[in-house]
Design a protein with these regions (language model features):
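Short beta-strand-to-loop acidic/aromatic patch adjacent to the donor-nucleotide binding site
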Residues: 82-93
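Conserved donor NDP-sugar-binding/catalytic core segment of glycosyltransferases
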Residues: 93, 97-116
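Active-site nucleotide-sugar/metal-binding loop of Leloir-type enzymes
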Residues: 74-84
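A conserved hydrophobic helix/loop-capping motif in glycosyltransferases and polysaccharide synthases
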Residues: 3-12, 19, 26, 36
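Active-site phosphate/pyrophosphate- and oxyanion-stabilizing loops and adjacent acidic/basic residues
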Residues: 21, 47, 74-75, 100
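A short, glycine-/small-residue-rich helix N-cap motif at loop->alpha-helix starts
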Residues: 64-71, 77
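Acidic donor-binding segment of Leloir-type glycosyltransferases
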Residues: 20-62
Length: 116
């Protein structure tokens, strides 16, 4: 089972770096990190994204939001290749217990397609 950890970004800084580092440390090898950025103009954000995407295998694209949040989320979804998509805000960290057990939870509940 492959999970896509996906997020939309725009000018996040320290929280984005913490989240990427957390995901790299806690995701399984077959999982992916997917980021769609709304052309951040914050230099620190650009530096974080450039550095982390060059060090780690992160699927990254930039696309203008153009006041179309639904279109942005759909584009992000289409970038993902996992069996499940774990949508994150760039300023949140998933629980360590959840990261360790998410696949067991999903496998134990095969008829459920959405978790909140």
């Amino acid at each position: 089972m492959k999970i896509s950890y996906s997020m939309l970004t725009h000018n996040e800084t320290d929280s984005l770096l913490k989240l990427i580092e957390f995901l790299v440390k806690h995701k399984d090898e077959e999982d992916e990190i997917v980021i769609l950025d709304d052309y951040s103009d914050n230099e620190k954000t650009k530096e974080i994204l450039d550095t982390m995407c060059s060090i780690h295998e992160i699927k990254f694209e930039q696309r203008h939001l153009l006041k179309d949040y639904g279109g942005q989320k759909n584009h992000l979804k289409n970038m993902c290749t996992g069996d499940y998509i774990f949508n994150l805000d760039a300023d949140e960290l998933p629980n360590k217990w959840l990261m360790k057990n998410i696949k067991t939870i999903l496998e134990a509940n095969p008829t459920i397609d959405l978790y909140w």
